[in-house]
């Protein structure tokens, strides 16, 4: 469950993107957030995984106080949240599987990260993810070979 209680988000300079937001999204519920450009839709979504901090109120995800998360706890929390952005940032010249595995970089030690050495479990999870979105057959192709719809997946 995701729960916003009296949430405010004010950007530097004083722009208030969110004001007194109260919203509960229960497990299994599908929700559409619609509104005009600049209404705060993206800001609201980005507070869920703490890409943006809230300034007031409380935000909990499955009982976890998002505002209090830091460091390793925040990284562990984010592993369970998937976000699809309006514009995707694939590295076109590398393989599809390497693009997927790049999501594991925060969990690697500095040497693994620098050299791009991924543990077997990361490779298996990446392959599973590609299978789930029906592009496993594209795993070792360059990302720029994917159609727009495949890139979104």
Where are these regions (language model features)?
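Conserved ABC ATPase signature
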Residues: 141-150
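Conserved ABC transporter NBD signature motif
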Residues: 56-65, 77
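The feature captures the beta-strand-to-loop junction immediately N-terminal to the Walker
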Residues: 34-36
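Short coil-to-helix segment of the ABC ATPase nucleotide-binding domain corresponding to the Q-loop/switch region
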Residues: 93-108
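Helix-to-loop junction immediately C-terminal to a conserved catalytic motif
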Residues: 49
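Conserved ABC ATPase "signature" region
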Residues: 64-65, 108-138
